[in-house]
Design a protein with these regions (language model features):
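Short Ser/Thr-interspersed hydrophobic loop/turn segments at strand-loop and sheet-helix junctions
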Residues: 11-21, 42-59, 72, 76, ...
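A structural connector/turn signal
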Residues: 37-38, 66, 110
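Amphipathic alpha-helical coiled-coil/heptad-repeat segments
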Residues: 101-102, 119-148
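Short beta-strand-centered aromatic/proline hotspots
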Residues: 61-65
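Sequence-specific dsDNA recognition surfaces
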Residues: 1-2, 16-45
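A short glycine-rich beta-alpha junction/loop motif
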Residues: 69-77, 85-88, 108-127
Length: 148
């Protein structure tokens, strides 16, 4: 939860830096972070970020590449998965009605909607074998390409 700065070494991705599943990395602010904490919060390709509070609660972002050393802001949740789960398959799930229905059920209703890692870990996720996940992703990608 470090404050954003204009210059520095480590960038800090906020939910407001993500637009249409893209990050404009050159405008992501910097932050101060203890050197010992960097590896704990450092973003890697295939990480998925979730907004855990506010009007964008549940919004997710699949990190495809990380051209700069960057961490994620404190009001985001980061997940990493094993080789058993295709990151893009999970991202598509997080855009589905099943995901949003489960999120709504598990979201705390306060002045600012709120969810946490426990809410996400309790969700039911249809999980076919990895090979089938990649086939599903490819099929969805082809369908989206036709629409564009």
């Amino acid at each position: 939860n470090a404050p954003a700065k204009q210059c520095g070494r480590i960038r800090m991705v906020r939910i407001s830096d993500i637009h249409e599943n893209l990050v404009t990395w050159t405008t992501v602010p910097f932050c101060d972070i203890d050197e010992l904490d960097i590896s704990t919060y450092l973003l890697q390709p295939n990480d998925i970020l979730f907004a855990r509070t506010g009007g964008t609660v549940g919004k997710s972002f699949l990190v495809r590449d990380v051209p700069y050393e960057a961490i994620y802001a404190g009001y985001l949740i980061r997940t990493r998965y094993s080789a058993l789960l295709c990151p893009q398959y999970l991202k598509y799930f997080m855009e589905s009605p099943l995901y949003w229905q489960q999120l709504k059920t598990g979201t705390t209703a306060t002045a600012q909607p709120n969810c946490n890692g426990q809410t996400l870990s309790n969700m039911l996720l249809p999980l076919p074998p990895a090979k089938e996940q990649y086939r599903i992703v490819e099929k969805i990608n082809r369908a989206f390409a036709k629409v564009k």
